[in-house]
Regions:
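Hydrophobic alpha-helical connector segments
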Residues: 59, 70-104
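C-terminal peripheral helix-coil segments that are non-catalytic and often amphipathic
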Residues: 128-140, 166-198
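Hydrophobic/aromatic residues within well-ordered alpha-helical segments
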Residues: 60, 64, 68, 90, ...
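Short linear capping/connector segments at secondary-structure termini
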Residues: 76, 107-114
Length: 198
């Protein structure tokens, strides 16, 4: 049991160190040697916990999204549209960080490059964090809408990241985020007043 605990602590430390390194240096520039040096382990120990470097990235990404989910959870109010409001707030927080922090933008840009056609996994993880709905049922009923949001989000945010100077010179964060959230409202057949109220 003690060995398992040490292993989990090492894994957590790898994720925390990589979050810092990916943020400061970028994913591609971070080496196993960098990670091992800061964690205080050998390269082989990293591979034991994360067979591929992309596995580390996935763990860091999931952890970062979990922190964002906690921020959202602290602001959700009782509302007949709480699922949608949580969804909007989640993306607003991510968008705010993406807009105002160059290192975060670089981290997210890599996420969009790694994105595949697995929105089910992403949204299952997202909605499970809030305990708002029966996830399987909600995913089944809204599969097309969720896929539309997922791929719209990847494309738009990738474009913002790649052309940030253009967007930041021509639009405010509020204009861009409101535009995005209004598109989500349209996809989910929600009244646009919800965006203005949120």
């Amino acid at each position: 049991m003690a060995q398992y605990k040490v292993g989990m602590e090492t894994k957590s430390k790898i994720i925390e160190v990589c979050r810092k390194l990916f943020y400061e240096k970028g994913y591609t520039e971070t080496t196993y040697k960098d990670i091992a040096s800061l964690v205080g382990i050998k390269d082989a120990s990293i591979v034991y916990h994360f067979p591929q470097k992309s596995d580390i990235y996935s763990a860091v990404y999931s952890s970062a999204m979990g922190k964002c989910s906690e921020e959202v959870r602290s602001y959700i109010t009782k509302n007949e549209n709480k699922e949608y409001l949580a969804f909007m707030l989640y993306y607003y927080i991510l968008g705010y960080k993406n807009w105002h922090d160059e290192n975060y933008r670089r981290f997210m840009a890599y996420s969009f490059n790694m994105a595949n056609s697995a929105p089910y996994t992403f949204y299952n993880d997202y909605f499970s964090r809030f305990d708002l709905v029966n996830v399987d049922e909600f995913m089944k009923e809204n599969a097309l809408k969720l896929r539309s949001c997922y791929f719209m989000d990847i494309g738009f945010n990738k474009d913002v990241g790649e052309n940030f100077n253009y967007y930041s010179e021509n639009y405010t964060f509020i204009e861009v985020s409101t535009h995005t959230l209004l598109m989500y409202a349209k996809i989910f057949d929600m009244p646009s007043e919800l965006v203005n109220r949120a």
